[in-house]
UniProtKB/Swiss-Prot annotation:
Keywords: Aminoacyl-tRNA synthetase, ATP-binding, Cytoplasm, Ligase, Magnesium, Metal-binding, Nucleotide-binding, Protein biosynthesis
Subunit and partners: Tetramer of two alpha and two beta subunits.
Reaction(s) this enzyme catalyzes, per UniProt: tRNA(Phe) + L-phenylalanine + ATP = L-phenylalanyl-tRNA(Phe) + AMP + diphosphate + H(+)
The EC number(s) this enzyme carries: 6.1.1.20
PANTHER family noted in UniProt: PHENYLALANINE--TRNA LIGASE, MITOCHONDRIAL, PHENYLALANYL-TRNA SYNTHETASE
Family assignment from sequence similarity: Belongs to the class-II aminoacyl-tRNA synthetase family. Phe-tRNA synthetase alpha subunit type 1 subfamily.
Main localization (coarse): cytoplasm
Superkingdom of origin organism: Bacteria
Annotated cofactor note: Binds 2 magnesium ions per tetramer.
Protein name as catalogued: Phenylalanine--tRNA ligase alpha subunit
Keyword flag Membrane: no
Cofactor(s) in the UniProt record: Mg(2+)
GO molecular function, one term: tRNA binding
């Protein structure tokens, strides 16, 4: 057996060790043949031969394992050495990530209102009917609910259709004055060139004592905000309807594409609708058990702002993961 011990010691690769193992321990290997030859020996010799073979069997296996470990360690060290990196050398620049244009726009919106002392509030995306509708002056079977195609679960749970429930929960857990915005994802059953089933909103709320908040306050901050976002644009307020505000208004800016002269994007009107706002309806304050207060609220679609800022024609392109498109907004 000395020959096999020498072969193991001299082996220079893991593959060679495997060949030796098969030659020794295979079904037709050396040890199997030696054990088979025992049949020809006497009973006394069989015992002695079996003892010697078992000792060799154990010792050879241990030698194989140890030599294999040694060779594997050597191979690993050589491999690591061949792949060593000189950290002092100049390297080619690697691709770095960047914020999605929707998140860039969201951050810019939050930055403005944070500078105006609005706190940022977040909430759950799965809401109940009360916080999403009833507390906002939208009782069951109210026709205005048809304005929002809702994803429903069981037990009157739903995916929120706006971030207004965050305002309701904030008012129910806090006392005025309140000065907050609620950015986040919302969900509606729409999918076309200007709508997606999931999009982002930022809604704002300011509540103070009765008579302390006026439409003039709302108008001032929204005009300042829109000039911050779009530069030197004209702003106009149009009367509108929202169940949770009274009076209500839609806010338009002069078209950022044609500068108000009229184009296909603005339907030749020279104006683009960008957000809705109004004075909080007394029924909303009643739902959260507020008394002797006044306030204003507003809401905007972040994707809408991103499309106007970056002049993107199709809302759906923001969610398709097109690297060529997204790389333009680094």
């Amino acid at each position: 057996m000395k020959h096999w011990y020498d072969l193991i010691t001299e082996a220079q690769s893991v593959e060679k060790i495997e060949e030796i193992r098969i030659s020794l321990f295979g079904k037709k290997g050396v040890l199997a043949a030696e054990f088979a030859r025992m049949k020809e020996a006497s009973d006394e010799e069989k015992s002695k031969i079996a003892q010697e073979l078992n000792i060799h069997k154990t010792t050879l296996m241990n030698e194989l394992v140890q030599r294999k470990i040694t060779l594997q360690t050597q191979e690993l060290q050589e491999h690591m050495k061949s792949e060593a990196i000189d950290v002092t050398m100049f390297s080619s620049s690697s691709e770095s990530g960047a914020l999605h244009p929707v998140m860039q726009t969201m951050d810019r919106i939050v930055e403005y209102f944070s500078s105006m002392n609005f706190t940022v509030k977040t909430g759950t995306m799965v809401e109940d009917d009360f916080n999403n509708f009833e507390a906002l002056n939208l009782p069951k079977y109210h026709p205005a609910r048809d304005m929002q195609d809702t994803f429903y679960f069981k037990d009157e749970m739903l995916l929120r259709t706006h971030t207004s429930p965050v305002q309701i929960r904030t008012m129910m857990s806090s006392k005025p004055p309140i000065r907050m915005i609620a950015p986040g994802a919302v969900f509606r059953r729409d999918y076309d060139i200007t709508h997606t089933p999931m999009f982002h909103q930022v809604e704002g709320l300011l509540v103070d004592k009765e008579g302390a908040v006026s439409f003039a306050n709302l108008k001032f901050i929204l005009e300042d905000f829109l000039k911050y976002m779009f530069g030197d644009v004209e702003v106009r307020f149009r009367p509108s309807f929202f169940p949770f505000t009274e009076p209500s208004a839609e806010v338009d800016i002069s078209c950022v594409f044609c500068k108000g002269s009229g184009c296909r994007v603005c339907s030749k009107t020279g104006w683009l609708e960008v957000l809705g706002c109004g004075i909080v309806d007394p029924n909303v304050f009643e739902a959260v058990k507020y008394q002797n207060v006044s306030g204003y609220a507003f809401g905007l679609g972040v994707e809408r702002f991103a499309m106007l800022i970056h002049q993107i024609g199709d809302l759906r392109s923001l969610f398709e993961g097109d690297i060529k498109l997204l790389e333009q907004f680094r």
